């Protein structure tokens, strides 16, 4: 009743009491506000927005009311009737409109039957409004989640996946997809008819498309049937091919399943994961296989000689790097230097070939060598792997893997690395000299300074290797030697000289010839040619003769397998390139010529067996330079036709190498050279003589290369006889140069007849070590310095000066090649018949061919201990083992492997005659020099020690390498001219010649202390009295030639206690010597 009374009193009552009360209060409140708003509007103006009327002005009420719109509601009226309908809307007074209202409870039955569409109930008649089945959360919570809710309900929410069915075109009825019928509603033929009839256009369309294709002439002829049968047969074969079948299956199979099918995400992910796992597993397996192969290759590399070339290309970098590490890090520095050289080589040479060769060289040399080999470039590959370099590089790679290879290569290859670049052109010095060499070489005077520093760093690396010393000599030859050559060339005609080197690039030997540089001093052309083909014959072929060098390289590698004979063959090969190169050498240098000079220079550096005492070399160089000057004119006339003669001589030398007698002149000269190197291991002084001999010989080579092709052999013998210490080898060298004797020098490297070579004066002075000369000789040949070590024993090897060594090497090379360890017995013959070898160059070739066995056996006793070393340091052991002639001969075997270095070293000796004598002084009694000859087997330091101890000779091959490694640039300086020759850079410029010289001295040092190569290198000052005594005589002449180019550095080199007298004479050579010494020490 209370409620009713209240409703009656309220005109607007009709809803629920609560709603009405709110409505009333709101309405009342609205009215005053409206009034106020109106008054304010009247007073303030019409800007005031009119407010909503009635309930529309109540925001909260409107929110609740509108939420009910569209819902089914029951409206109770004051009359007691209840209507149910859809709440449609309401007015400002809250008059309610219902759709399809139905009277649930009515007093008037007749009305109940009527259902109007809309009924509006005034607000005052409504008592309550109740909404049924109303979701109070729908409007607020579910709206923005509609999509997500639908997705959750429909997509992927089903626990069971619907089975997928493939699409079947027949399911929807056959679909005609043919174009022939009027599927699209019109007939193409009708179109043609209409165009023809209406427009007069006739179509040439033919269903057979005969105008677009070539119809087959299917006749009944027999030919057509045969062709058809043949075609069907071929088609059947192709279709039956498993590969073809797989493709057809892929094309004709269920492409939808492969490319267009819908796959469950989980299944696809699983498959992808499985595929990823399989792929990862496959990659892991492949990586493991590659690693195993690499390890297997590394393991085989030290032992493989025949596959050395392949391995060097395939895995030389990997293996060599590893081996380089084993070598104790000098190789690494060597590599760094080498890479510098290679970079400079690129800059100076701008020749892809040099870099390519460098790469090849690195392959052989090893990873370190690869950089170094880059500098060697062609030198190591073409020349570096020359009998010495090849034997050394190959053997080293065989024995010590990369490390040994690096060292051995360094003697030939290492030097070659530098020399190669200089050989290609003066610029090649860069690769040799490292940074500045190529630049320095490009500029005659500047080259020395640049060459020295670059070589300094390079020397440091080279020193690390036994061959490093030799390498340094080569580097000096490339830079300093080039400088020496430039000294000669610069003094005389630096550019021509480089040209000479370019063409003599294969005769880069001039660099190898330490004496060769002095010769270059005497005659720039000859000096550049002075990279004695004979001496450099180990590596030179690589530089100048790109193809020939490669061929020679291959031959060298093959010969390396043959070890000692191969060096000779390589020498012959090298001689050929040099002969070819020698001719152009005289021509004005072009960029190509410079590049060739660089390559040749690298080769010459390889040849730089500076074993002959530098003084002897200088003397011989001076003598030979004079001769060469006379001969150069002849050669210049002959050089045009020089390559044929040189090639002939090369062939002869090769024949000598094979026959040893065919080219006894050239080959024996090489043998003599190689013997001096070889003997120098036995006798430090002897090695220097060969170097001097080589240097003059190199000059002679340039002057007389072609004339001397025949005459030089005699001349060499004569020189050897006249210049027992150095000159006889120089004639040989000259012959080699004229004949392109680099190969000859390679022939020398197999100094199987090395003992015969002992005839050089230095060798005479140092007869005692001769028993080991064969092995050492090869080593010394590879390592110019080791030869001088033999010097102490040369008294018996007096007979043949470095020339004697060279002459014996022909036989010696073969003998060595045949039996590298034969040297022990051969040394005595060498010293005794050393003189004979020079004269007996031919006989030495043939006789030593037979002799090597005896010498080999003599050396074998001591060498065998080295063979055991193979495991620890494969390269060193092999060089010492006489019975591992082929691989070890070139790389490890002091006899065979080092013989090629000896050949190279004699050339070195020639140029750095002054440096070598000083080296000889420090190394006079030290086998470390010989070890330097062994530097190719860088890891064979222990082997060198044991081999030298057992053999009684300096272990050139094994010892020198470690010595050089251990010795930093500074130690090498000490050994060479003075340990205080701190400025490696200075040495670097005269580096190449001096390195060659140093190589000779290093063998001398090695000879005194065969047991320990490192000690041997350090003792070089001690042997200086013993080996220095003989060498000083040669020192003045050689230094005079050497220092010309390296005036500044030479003095410091001269300042060294090793070569005080040489300094004034040939500062360049002394510098070179210092460089060589540094290299030697580093290798230690």
UniProtKB/Swiss-Prot annotation:
Keywords: Cytoplasm, Developmental protein, Phosphoprotein. GO terms for cellular component: cytoplasm; cytoplasmic stress granule; ribonucleoprotein granule. Residues 1-10 have a biased composition (Basic residues). Belongs to the ataxin-2 family. SMART domains: LsmAD (SM01272). It comes from Drosophila melanogaster (Fruit fly). Residues 871-885 have a biased composition (Pro residues). Homodimer. In the circadian pacemaker neurons, core component of the Atx2-tyf activator complex composed of at least Atx2, tyf, pAbp, Lsm12a. In the circadian pacemaker neurons, also a core component of the Atx2-Not1 repressor complex composed of at least Atx2, tyf, pAbp, me31B. Interacts (via PAM2 motif) with pAbp. Interacts (via N-terminus) with tyf independently of pAbp. Forms a subcomplex composed of Atx2 and pAbP which can associate with the 5' cap of pre-mRNAs independently of tyf, Lsm12a or me31B. Interacts with Lsm12a and me31B. RNA binding protein that regulates various processes including circadian behaviors, actin filament formation, eye development and oocyte formation. Forms a complex with tyf and pAbp which functions in adult circadian pacemaker neurons to sustain circadian rhythms likely by switching between activator and repressor modes of post-transcriptional regulation via interaction with Lsm12a or me31B. Forms an activator complex (Atx2-tyf activator complex) via association with Lsm12a and activates the TYF-dependent translation of per to maintain 24 hour periodicity in circadian locomotor behaviors. GO terms for molecular function: mRNA binding; RNA binding. Residues 265-300 have a biased composition (Basic and acidic residues). This is Ataxin-2 homolog.
């Amino acid at each position: 009743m209370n409620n009713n009374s209240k409703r009656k009193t309220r005109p607007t009552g009709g809803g629920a009491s609560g709603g009405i009360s709110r409505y009333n209060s709101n309405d009342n409140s609205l009215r005053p506000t409206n009034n106020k708003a109106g008054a304010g509007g009247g007073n303030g103006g019409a800007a005031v927005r009119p407010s909503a009327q009635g309930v529309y002005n109540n925001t909260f009420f409107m929110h609740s009311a509108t939420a009910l719109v569209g819902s089914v509601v029951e409206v109770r009226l004051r009359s007691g009737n209840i209507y149910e309908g859809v709440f449609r809307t309401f007015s400002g007074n809250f008059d309610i409109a219902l759709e399809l209202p139905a009277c649930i409870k009515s007093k008037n039955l007749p009305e109940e039957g009527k259902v109007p569409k809309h009924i509006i109930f005034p607000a005052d008649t409504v008592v309550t409004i109740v909404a049924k089945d109303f979701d109070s959360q729908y409007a607020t919570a579910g709206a923005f989640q509609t999509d997500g809710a639908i997705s959750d309900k429909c997509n992927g929410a089903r626990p069971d996946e619907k089975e997928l069915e493939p699409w079947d075109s027949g399911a929807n009825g056959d679909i005609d997809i043919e174009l022939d019928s009027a599927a699209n509603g019109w007939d193409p033929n009708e179109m043609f008819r209409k165009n023809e009839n209406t427009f007069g256009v006739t179509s040439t369309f033919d269903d057979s498309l005969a105008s677009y294709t070539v119809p087959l002439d299917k006749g009944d002829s027999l030919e057509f049937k045969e062709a058809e049968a043949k075609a069907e047969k071929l088609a059947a074969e192709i279709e039956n091919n498993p590969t073809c079948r797989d493709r057809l299956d892929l094309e004709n199979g269920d492409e939808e399943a492969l490319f267009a099918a819908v796959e469950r995400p989980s299944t696809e992910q699983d498959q992808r994961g499985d595929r990823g796992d399989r792929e990862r597993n496959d990659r892991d397996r492949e990586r493991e296989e590659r690693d195993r192969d690499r390890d297997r290759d590394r393991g085989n590399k030290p032992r493989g000689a025949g596959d050395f070339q392949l391995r060097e290309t395939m895995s030389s970098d990997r293996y060599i790097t590893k081996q380089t590490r084993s070598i104790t890090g000098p190789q690494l520095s060597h590599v760094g230097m080498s890479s510098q050289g290679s970079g400079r080589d690129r800059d100076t040479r701008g020749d892809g070939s040099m870099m390519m060769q460098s790469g090849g060289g690195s392959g052989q040399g090893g990873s370190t060598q690869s950089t170094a080999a880059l500098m060697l470039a062609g030198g190591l590959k073409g020349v570096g792997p020359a009998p010495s370099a090849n034997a050394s590089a190959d053997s080293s790679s065989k024995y010590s893997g990369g490390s040994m290879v690096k060292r051995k290569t360094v003697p030939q290859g290492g030097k070659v690395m530098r020399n190669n670049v200089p050989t290609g052109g003066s610029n090649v010095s860069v690769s040799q000299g490292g940074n500045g060499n190529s630049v320095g070489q490009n500029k005659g005077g500047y080259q020395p300074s640049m060459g020295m520093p670059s070589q300094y760093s390079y020397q440091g690396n080279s020193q690390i290797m036994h061959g490093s010393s030799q390498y340094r000599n080569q580097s000096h030859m490339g830079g300093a030697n080039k400088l020496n050559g430039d000294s000669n060339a610069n003094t005389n005609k630096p550019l021509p000289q480089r040209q000479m080197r370019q063409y003599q690039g294969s005769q880069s030997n001039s660099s190898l010839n330490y004496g060769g540089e002095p010769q270059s001093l005497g005659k720039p052309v000859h000096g550049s040619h002075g990279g004695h083909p004979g001496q450099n014959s180990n590596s030179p072929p690589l530089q100048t003769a790109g193809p020939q060098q490669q061929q020679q390289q291959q031959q060298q590698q093959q010969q390396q397998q043959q070890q000692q004979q191969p060096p000779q063959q390589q020498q012959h090969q090298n001689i050929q390139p040099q002969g070819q190169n020698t001719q152009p050498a005289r021509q004005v240098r072009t960029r190509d010529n410079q590049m060739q000079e660089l390559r040749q220079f690298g080769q010459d550096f390889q040849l730089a067996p500076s074993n002959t005492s530098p003084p002897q070399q200088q003397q011989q160089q001076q003598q030979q330079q004079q001769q060469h000057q006379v001969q150069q004119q002849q050669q210049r006339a002959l050089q045009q036709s020089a390559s044929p003669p040189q090639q002939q001589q090369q062939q002869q030398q090769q024949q000598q190498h094979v026959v040893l007698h065919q080219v006894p002149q050239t080959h024996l000269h090489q043998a003599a050279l190689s013997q001096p190197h070889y003997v120098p291991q036995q006798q430090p002084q002897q090695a220097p003589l060969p170097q001097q001999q080589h240097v003059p010989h190199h000059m002679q080579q340039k002057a007389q290369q072609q004339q001397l092709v025949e005459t030089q052999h005699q001349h060499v013998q004569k020189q050897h006889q006249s210049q027992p210490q150095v000159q006889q080898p120089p004639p040989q060298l000259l012959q080699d140069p004229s004949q392109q004797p680099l190969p000859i020098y390679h022939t020398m490297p197999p100094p199987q007849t090395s003992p015969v070579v002992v005839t050089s004066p230095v060798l005479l002075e140092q007869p005692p070590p001769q028993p080991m000369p064969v092995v050492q000789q090869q080593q010394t040949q590879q390592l110019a310095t080791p030869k001088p070590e033999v010097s102490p024993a040369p008294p018996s090897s007096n007979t043949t000066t470095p020339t004697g060594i060279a002459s014996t090497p022909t036989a010696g090379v073969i003998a060595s090649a045949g039996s590298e360890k034969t040297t022990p017995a051969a040394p005595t013959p060498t010293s005794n018949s050393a003189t004979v070898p020079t004269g007996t160059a031919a006989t030495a070739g043939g006789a030593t061919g037979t002799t090597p066995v005896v010498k080999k056996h003599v050396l074998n006793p001591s060498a065998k201990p080295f063979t055991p070393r193979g495991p620890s340091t494969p390269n060193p052991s092999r060089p010492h083992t006489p019975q591992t002639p082929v691989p070890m001969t070139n790389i490890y075997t002091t006899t065979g492997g080092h013989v090629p270095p000896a050949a190279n070293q004699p050339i070195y000796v020639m140029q750095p005659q002054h440096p070598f004598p000083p080296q000889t002084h420090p190394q006079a009694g030290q086998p470390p020099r010989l070890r330097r000859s062994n530097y190719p087997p860088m890891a064979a330091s222990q082997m060198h020690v044991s081999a030298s101890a057992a053999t009684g000779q300096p272990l050139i091959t094994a010892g020198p390498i470690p010595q050089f490694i251990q010795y930093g640039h500074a130690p090498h300086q000490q050994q060479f001219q003075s340990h205080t020759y701190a400025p490696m850079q200075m040495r670097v410029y005269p580096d190449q010649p001096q390195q060659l010289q140093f190589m000779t001295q290093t063998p001398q040092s090695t000879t005194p202390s065969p047991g320990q190569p490192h000690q041997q290198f350090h003792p070089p000052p001690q042997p200086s009295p013993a080996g220095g005594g003989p060498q000083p005589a040669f020192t003045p002449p050689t230094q005079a030639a050497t220092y010309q180019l390296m005036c500044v550095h030479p003095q410091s080199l001269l300042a060294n206690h090793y070569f005080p007298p040489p300094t004034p004479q040939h500062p360049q050579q002394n510098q070179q010597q210092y460089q060589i010494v540094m290299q030697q020490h580093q290798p230690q």
